[in-house]
């Protein structure tokens, strides 16, 4: 039922976009009669309008090429161009339409030399719709999935560095959501809840940029539930992995205090992440 509702919504958006696009641009763009290479004419005009951020006009040229010249060598790039025009509009509706275009490209042209670009733009469309850490993270999860697909399949492509950066940002956003929930549990003194949220998060993503706070909160939570031997490794990981952190000095003090009170600091528990 949800899938059908989503499909109906997408169909309605596509139909509305076609109507509005046609009205705004004066109708379909066609090459002048007698043009030697009409498909190239449409492609060049689409590129010119795309460069000038004339999204609707560019889309009409690309669309005419895609629909009228199925054997054109420019057809695949024009299909990408349609997606890029929707990306340029930067609205919730246009991102949905862009995602549809890039998914179709990957289905129609899975071995095309620009398939990597379609995958990158697909991931970016989700990335551009990510919400703040304590709001719905559906788009964040989709961005992670699609950027991970890019990193897995296209590690030798020039956009790999940017893809990895965006993947890291998306993972951090999702981790910040878990961290926020854990912080709430810590604040209301439900320390098992904080531990139960943070440990799986760090196991799943040990490279979380904000893990210094997670380490400190875990150490403090284990101390609160009278498990100092479990707390110590998290304070030590914080000190070892971060030269700068607002929790660094506090962690060092907790390490000194725990080592002074534990029967033997040597061989103390390795921590719940092991």
Predicted feature residues:
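Bacterial N-terminal signal peptides
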Residues: 10-19
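Acidic, polar-rich low-complexity tracts and alpha-helical solenoid repeat scaffolds
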Residues: 2-7, 20-274
């Amino acid at each position: 039922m949800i899938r059908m509702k989503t499909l109906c919504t997408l169909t309605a958006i596509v139909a509305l976009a076609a109507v509005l696009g046609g009205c705004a641009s004066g109708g379909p763009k066609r090459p002048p009669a007698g043009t030697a290479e009409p498909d190239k004419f449409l492609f060049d005009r689409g590129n010119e309008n795309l460069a000038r951020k004339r999204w609707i006009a560019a889309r009409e040229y690309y669309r005419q090429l895609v629909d009228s010249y199925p054997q054109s060598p420019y057809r695949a790039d024009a299909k990408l161009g349609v997606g890029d025009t929707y990306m340029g509009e930067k609205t919730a509706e246009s991102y949905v339409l862009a995602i549809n275009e890039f998914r179709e490209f990957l289905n129609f042209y899975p071995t095309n030399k620009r398939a990597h670009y379609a995958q990158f733009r697909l991931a970016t469309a989700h990335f551009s719709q990510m919400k703040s850490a304590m709001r719905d993270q559906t788009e964040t999860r989709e961005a992670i999935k699609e950027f991970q697909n890019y990193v897995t399949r296209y590690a030798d492509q020039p956009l790999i560095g940017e893809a990895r950066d965006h993947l890291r940002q998306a993972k951090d956003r999702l981790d910040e959501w878990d961290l926020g929930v854990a912080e709430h549990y810590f604040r209301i003194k439900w320390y098992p809840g904080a531990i139960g949220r943070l440990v799986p998060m760090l196991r799943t993503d040990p490279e979380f940029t904000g893990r210094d706070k997670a380490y400190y909160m875990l150490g403090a939570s284990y101390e609160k539930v009278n498990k100092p031997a479990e707390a110590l490794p998290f304070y030590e990981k914080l000190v070892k992995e971060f030269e700068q952190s607002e929790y660094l000095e506090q962690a060092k003090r907790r390490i000194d205090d725990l080592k002074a009170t534990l029967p033997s600091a040597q061989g103390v528990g390795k921590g719940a992440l092991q």
